[in-house]
């Protein structure tokens, strides 16, 4: 019996295009939800964006804590769903029929890249379920309790989940941007054009954030910790938007 060949007609192409659009929609919605910390500009949070962690907006003792924790959970689940859709559907970041798609399916880079995005989504969702009990950068009493180890275990767990989220985001950003640069035919998609700059900016913001955290832990001030971390999150969200837009652009070509 002859081996049946996979379908490649108009119906199959339409199905792939629809799947890619859904994936892009999940990523875009996740990026927007992930950026809702910016609403602190309009809300009387009482926390300074220059010196506080973004996670402290969602602390249990903060007036809008439940609101920000809920949005973090939604953001993480949306991005996780998009990444798992890419992995389980054996798709590529930008479709199946392009040079990028053909090259990406032959290697492990897209799998690791999308696994990084999935880790980012899962860890972000976990962050929302492991809230800080108070805002150490704005509350001297909270800081004293934290340094004395007199805070809930969720403080340590939150630090781990936050680190995993950023690590996953960096893995995905670097690898999927590399794939787009290496394999996308001209005219280049937005991810190939803009992705490298966002990756560099994210690395710089991450370095600044780590230095600021070290300074704060050593009692040497915040070094603009709030600004650094907000830039870090902003560049991740912007990259996700670019990825989603590039996926939609590819879907239109199918």
Protein language model annotation of sequence segments:
Residues 14-250:
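Hydrophobic, aromatic-enriched alpha-helical segments typical of multi-pass transmembrane helices
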């Amino acid at each position: 019996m002859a081996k049946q060949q996979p379908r490649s007609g108009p119906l199959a192409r339409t199905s792939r295009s629809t799947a890619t659009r859904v994936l892009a929609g999940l990523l875009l919605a996740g990026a927007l939800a992930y950026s809702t910390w910016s609403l602190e500009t309009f809300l009387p949070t009482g926390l300074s964006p220059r010196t506080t962690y973004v996670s402290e907006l969602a602390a249990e003792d903060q007036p809008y804590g439940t609101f920000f924790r809920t949005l973090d959970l939604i953001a993480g689940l949306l991005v996780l769903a998009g990444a798992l859709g890419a992995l389980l559907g054996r798709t590529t970041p930008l479709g199946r029929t392009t040079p990028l798609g053909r090259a990406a399916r032959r290697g492990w880079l897209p799998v690791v890249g999308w696994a990084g995005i999935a880790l980012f989504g899962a860890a972000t969702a976990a962050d929302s379920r492991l809230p800080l009990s108070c805002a150490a950068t704005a509350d001297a009493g909270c800081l004293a309790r934290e340094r004395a180890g007199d805070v809930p275990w969720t403080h340590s767990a939150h630090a781990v989940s936050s680190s995993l989220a950023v690590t996953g985001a960096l893995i995905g950003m670097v690898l999927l941007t590399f794939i787009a640069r290496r394999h996308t035919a001209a005219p280049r998609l937005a991810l190939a054009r803009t992705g490298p700059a966002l990756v560099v900016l994210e690395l710089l913001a991450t370095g600044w954030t780590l230095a600021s955290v070290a300074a704060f832990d050593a009692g040497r001030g915040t070094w603009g910790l709030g600004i650094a971390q907000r830039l870090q999150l902003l560049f991740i969200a912007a990259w996700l938007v670019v990825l989603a837009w590039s996926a939609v652009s590819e879907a239109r070509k199918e």
